[in-house]
Amino acid sequence: MSNEHGVPAPTLASRIHGCLLGGALGDALGDSVEAGPTAGTRGPSSQAGVGGFDDLSGVARFGDDTQLTLYTVDGLVEALEWANSGVGADVNACLWLAYLRWLASQGEEAPPSAPVPQPRWIDGHEVLRQRRHPEKDCITGLASGEMGTSFRPVNPEAKGVGTVMRSAPFGLVPHIASDAVYKLSSDAASLTHGHPSARQSAGIFSLLIHRLVSGAALADAAAEVTADAGALPDAAPELRERLEAALRLADKREAGPERPVQVLGEGRLAEEALAVALYAVLSTAPAEGEEKQPDRHFRDAVALAVKHGGASGTIGSLAGNILGALYGEDCLPAPWLAALEAPEVVRGMADQLVKVTTGEG
């Protein structure tokens, strides 16, 4: 069985590892762009076609995007562990408890009304306790001590990237319906963000990952989730508009530096970051009939994503998630992986998700 462009279809385990590691790589590269020389890196070259870990000095550190993505994995793993043992569990409650443990790792305290979660394997890693410029709304939403729901979300006006940046793992769970993937993701987004565009962006991003993991071609999956975004009850118009713009812009392959920002936004809001990442992976994809190595597509897409500006770490992370889910871990450039901070932690969480979903490992 082959994937698009003649690339052999990856296994589910490879897609899970590829998605999580790809997101961490994009996050690390994007964070280096945001921080620049103050982070002890030179940052990507501004020359066209250049940009990657080859341009960095020292270890490439990922940010809060990857931290929260891994805690999303942990919450899902706990819920699936309960389910596999024959005990039903509230998935969103498991995710809330996981996020509360992340909150504590950042030196923040939840009010006494919030539960005190029991520690798990993920909590023993120093790299996940480092404070890496966490998104404000994630902190305030969790520190409220309230478990937000889709009917009563916390931070009702929050529409930043903190939802979409952590939502790839929902799309990695196999054998569940698309509407269930969307609900899991958007419900979890309600734990920290209340604005419809932030919650719907998270759900649509998870659906995109789900379709890719299920074997859909990249362009087909992108078109499908764009249509899904417009068909949602009480659909946020800005999400559909940004995604449609990303498809149009990628199709025209207009690579001028100003136009993507004008059309897609700066990338600081959830729907903008998703649209920019989608544009980056589509506009760098091989043309029909063209042979292209997956690792080159990954390099080109992530480099373009992080050059956009705005929340570069998030945009790079989303692009890395998408291509890792599409191609599996074979698309990840070996030199980039060698430079990545704590890949064993990312792999460890990927292994746990593989085990509870497939029984492997």
Give the label of every model feature segment:
Residues 1-361:
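Structured, active/binding-site neighborhoods that engage oxygen-rich ligands
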